[in-house]
Amino acid sequence: MSCDNKQALSGVTLAAIGVVYGDIGTSPLYTLRECLSGQFGIRAEPAAILGFLSLIFWLLILVVSVKYLSFVMRADNAGEGGILTLMSLATRNASPRWTPVLIILGLIGGSFFYGEVVITPAMSVMSAIEGLSLMAPSLDPYIVPLSVLVLTLLFAIQKHGTAMVGKLFAPIMLTWFLTLAVLGLRSIIQNPEVLGALNPIWALRFFAEYQTTSFFALGAVVLAITGVEALYADMGHFGKNPIRLAWFVVVLPSLVLNYFGQGALLLDNPAAIANPFFLLAPKWALLPLLVLATMATVIASQAVISGVFSLTRQAVRLGYLSPIRIVHTSEQESGQIYIPVINWILYISVVIVIMSFEHSSNLAAAYGIAVTGTMVLTSILFCSVAKNSWHWPTYLVAALFALLLAIDVPLFAANLGKIFSGGWLPLTLGAVMFTLMTSWKSERFQLIRRLNEHGNSLEPMIASLEKSPPTRVAGTAVYMSRVVNVIPHALLHNLKHNKVLHERIILLTLRVEDVPYVHNVRRVCIEQLSPTFWRVVASYGWRETPNMEEIFHRCNAEGLSCRMMETSFFMAHESLIMKERPCAANCLCCCSATPCAQRISSRSRPIG
């Protein structure tokens, strides 16, 4: 590898540390504390401490290092990852009988993310600010207001973008991980026998000694791997190799050292279970550590917020959510977006969660069920891709599937015990999002079917207009067309009421493919239907934003002369009324909310 390539890899790896690992990197704030908090009847005694440490270590190895970094990240769609991407890959070569099942599983996984995203910022920030109570117990009543204040500021700056502060994420998170390592190593040196927990025999002894209780305790152990989906979801931003390098060189060693450092502290002083993370530090370092922890949790929250923006955009592009306003906060980076309605719904939800649960330990009961549910679904979809798309041998896929579920299912089952103590929250939010996505997709499908069944066929209508032409006016008219073989409703409406047509008519259809990017060579397909009618189909990936100037440029390059200032745009607001369904008034063609429509709104004529 050349020197320049090494420098580029180092830079991207550092950036990945700042974005990808924020959630899983702040888990040491609360994981071991929740494992030994007494909620499972397990005290901070040596067998339990070493057992939990062994479980945490081997979960990091098996789930993160093996499952996600070694297997799941192989499944990319032009370099992109994430649960909806995995769903698209799984359905490409699946049998028609299984395709609807795989789509439902993918949508459930995406819905789980919406459920968990409300908890992550609240849990992370509260865990950091709770360090105040160690410095001055009298400050304990201010933890909730301060947590709300920090998150209010974070959500308020979203509309301005995070390009400037984003440059600080990597050095702050690198400092955070180095601090984790130093604090943990300092404690391990004082009590090195804690390293015995690297032996998986301690995990087996833990199950043997605590039996049924140990199973439910897995619900707390799983807190160590929350955020693991970010490794796969952010693959398109940073690439596989930088994410893997960051994990094995920086993140994994730092996490292991810190967890084992907390364990060494607890072996010497079980009373430190009140907050083992902050008690690792000397008293003089508590305030700097509190500030650093707060910054790290804010960065972790930012990564989650950006993730939900990206997932929402992908769902909108793929037709699973209504078109909504998406603001690009950076002219250079297309991935930096802001969705106002999602931002403020998420903010209100997070504030309600903080004020309702009041302490991170209470919130921990709601944490993990959506993460483990997504892990199970990821395993199913990945094995489907391996079998149907990569044609791995059946015996190999079956063995891998059994191995993955042997880890994922117990973790998910252990978290089901949290349903009545807070786990209902992410499940309820996920159920709402799943209902919205499936209802929207279903109604959109029915609208397309109605348009095909009852709309005027394109070719006969054009032939009739050419044979008996109405009055023509100078210029070009672009009619947005949802269905390529049907005359747009806006054109019929214009012809009926105005009795005229422009001298050139372009029927434009925007098509979103299930890939992140479409090559420019395939961007525009032009077909001349008659001397005055053209059909243009513009294809985009779900990560791209339709651009009318670009479409016109491609049309000009292929011989169809188009000038923006001499063109009028017509759109129809179509809706399907479902009288017996709760979302009866849903409008399925909110053109004004689409990015392309926003760019041409000043020259458009909404009709119908």
Curated annotation (Swiss-Prot):
Pfam families: K_trans, K_trans_C. It comes from the Bacteria. It is a multi-pass membrane protein. The chain crosses the membrane at residues 9-29, 46-66, 99-119, 137-157, 165-185, 213-233, 247-267, 285-305, 337-357, 363-383, 396-416, 419-439. GO terms for molecular function: potassium ion transmembrane transporter activity; symporter activity. Keywords: Cell inner membrane, Cell membrane, Ion transport, Membrane, Potassium, Potassium transport, Symport, Transmembrane, Transmembrane helix, Transport. It catalyses: K(+)(in) + H(+)(in) = K(+)(out) + H(+)(out). Transport of potassium into the cell. Likely operates as a K(+):H(+) symporter. Belongs to the HAK/KUP transporter (TC 2.A.72) family. This is Probable potassium transport system protein Kup. It comes from Aeromonas salmonicida (strain A449).
